[in-house]
Curated annotation (Swiss-Prot):
Alphabetical list of InterPro entries matching this protein: TBP, TBP_CS, TBP_dom_sf, TBP_eukaryotic
Disordered as annotated region, ranges: 31-54
Coiled coil: none
Keyword Transcription regulation recorded: yes
Protein's organism: Takifugu rubripes (Japanese pufferfish)
GO biological process: DNA-templated transcription initiation; embryo development ending in birth or egg hatching; embryonic pattern specification; hemopoiesis
Protein name as it appears in the record: TATA box-binding protein-like 2
UniProtKB keywords: Developmental protein, DNA-binding, Nucleus, Transcription, Transcription regulation
The family this protein is said to belong to: Belongs to the TBP family.
The protein's role, per its UniProt record: TATA box-binding transcription factor. Members of the TBP family are differentially required to regulate transcription and development during early embryogenesis.
Gene name per UniProt: tbpl2
Cytoplasm in keyword set: no
Compartment(s) of residence: Nucleus
Length: 322
């Protein structure tokens, strides 16, 4: 090839390059050249550049996925900025926190599902633990009411046989009617009590308001019998029954109470106006009235009366008339 041919070839190449540059500046593209460049670009993107680890073109994916990628990138950037700020001084921390407050607030308003530091992004939501309800028991709800003792029944053994007719004739404040009741009925004023004296030497004392009064009254009756010439002794004193009463100060629905506690209670208003409640532990019988008055009987110690009332009080509160 001669030199003139080479010169013509280089001149044509230069002319073609200058024309291409001019077309680009004027915004003119030939279809053939554009298709060639697009195919070259796509082949280059599909080939070596993917192997080199460059990012893929995700423009053909749905908008939701692209938005999630952008939000994830934004979240990672914000976390990186927070870590960087935590390493700076206190002054820089205040300044950066003020600047970063606006985009964080905007991001939370636009995406309420991402609030809470990313907790709601996980498939498992943190649940607030529920406080178990503790059932009401007599220990947790004190009534503040103390039943008052009304009567104490005690027994004692005088240890000798007695002539009841002679005792009734010699003693004052004594009566004896064997046709009606086979015992001498004797009364004293202090403490105000009544005694039933049997021919076997057994005696029952009733009417005392406390354990001490009951014992004192029984000793006085034994002394009277001893003064009449009988070798009476004071043996086996024992309290058999204690009766107490109180007022809960609110009316009670006895019909609902007997339906709920059929196993322990009975209510026959035509026969007796009060509900009879038989408590198992302690073994106490309660008479409950509509007015709120409660009578407790069957106890041998004060503690049993107090325990029984504290057990029944929450139940009565549940059936209070509105």
């Amino acid at each position: 090839m001669d030199e003139s041919a080479l010169e013509r070839y280089f001149e044509d190449s230069i002319a073609n390059d200058s024309g291409f540059i001019l077309e680009e500046e004027l915004g003119l593209h030939s279809p053939a050249l554009s298709s060639t460049q697009d195919s070259t670009y796509l082949s280059g993107r599909a080939g070596p550049s993917r192997e080199s680890g460059a990012e893929l073109d995700l423009s053909f994916l749905p908008d939701d996925l692209s938005t999630q990628e952008e939000l994830g990138h934004h979240d990672n950037t914000a976390q990186a900025e927070d870590r960087a700020v935590s390493q700076d001084s206190a002054v820089c921390l205040d300044y950066d926190s003020q600047n970063s407050a606006t985009p964080a607030a905007t991001f939370d308003q636009q995406n309420p599902s991402l609030l809470g530091g990313g907790v709601h992004n996980s498939p498992f939501y943190s649940m607030t633990p529920m406080t178990p309800m503790t059932p009401m028991t007599p220990v947790t709800e004190r009534s503040g009411i103390i039943p008052q003792l009304q009567n104490i029944v005690s027994t004692v053994n005088l240890g000798c046989p007695l002539d009841l007719k002679f005792i009734a004739l010699q003693a004052r404040n004594a009566e004896y009617n064997p046709k009606r009741f086979a015992a001498v009925i004797m009364r004293i004023r202090e403490p105000r009590t009544t005694a039933l004296i049997f021919s076997s030497g057994k005696m029952v004392c009733t009417g005392a308001k406390s354990e001490e009064q009951s014992r004192l009254a029984a000793r006085k009756y034994a002394r009277v019998v001893q003064k009449l010439g009988f070798p009476a002794r004071f043996m086996d004193f024992k309290i058999q029954n204690m009766v107490a009463s109180c007022d809960v100060c609110f009316p009670i629905r006895l019909e609902g109470l007997v339906l709920t506690h059929q196993q322990f209670s009975s209510y026959e208003p035509e026969l007796f106006p009060g509900l009879i409640y038989r408590m198992v532990k302690p073994r106490i019988v309660l008479l409950i009235f509509v007015s709120g008055k409660v009578v407790l009987t069957g106890a041998k110690e004060r503690a049993e009366i107090y325990e029984a009332f504290e057990n029944i009080y929450p139940i009565l509160r549940g059936f209070r008339k509105q």
